[in-house]
Design a protein with these regions (language model features):
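Active-site-adjacent structural elements in enzyme catalytic cores
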Residues: 1-123
C-alpha cells in the first residue's frame, strides 16, 4: 500500500487512504485524486489515478522487490468486450503488449471501479 502514496493526494482523509489497503471480496479499482507530482503518462488528462491493490503473488513480489507500485494498463478497453484470452489481448494491443499475466483467480474478471472520494461506482 505504501507504494501508491507517491502517486495519490495524501492530503485526503486518512480513512479514505486506509480504505485502499482493505481487502475486498472482488477485484476493486479505486479512482483516487492524484498527487501534484504524478506524471500524465500515468494519469492522462485526468486529475485521478486508478489504484488497484492486489494479493496476486507475482505482482506482490514485483512491488516488494522493487519497492514500487507496478504501473500497468487494463486489458479492458473502454467500450469494447473484455479480452478473455491472449489472442484477444494481442488483437487489442498489437505490438504494444509486452507481457500479460496468465488468467487466474486474481485477474480473470474485470474489477469494479469506485471513486474513492464520492463512493460512486463506475463499473
Amino acid at each position: 500500500m505504501d507504494y501508491v502514496l507517491p502517486y495519490i493526494d495524501t492530503s485526503l482523509d486518512i480513512n479514505l487512504i486506509n480504505k485502499l489497503g482493505q481487502r475486498t471480496s472482488v477485484p476493486t479499482t479505486y479512482l483516487v485524486p492524484k498527487s501534484e507530482t504524478t506524471s500524465t503518462l500515468i494519469s492522462g488528462s485526468s486529475d485521478l489515478v486508478a489504484v488497484r491493490i492486489t494479493s496476486e503473488p507475482l505482482v506482490s513480489y514485483f512491488c516488494e522487490n522493487t519497492e514500487s507500485a507496478l504501473i500497468s494498463t487494463s486489458a479492458n478497453l473502454q467500450g469494447q468486450k473484455v479480452a478473455s484470452n491472449m489472442a484477444e489481448l494481442k488483437a487489442y494491443f498489437n505490438e504494444s503488449l509486452s507481457y500479460a499475466l496468465p488468467p487466474n483467480k486474481y485477474n480473470s474478471e474485470p474489477s469494479i471501479i469506485i471513486d474513492l472520494v464520492t463512493g460512486k461506482r463506475h463499473r
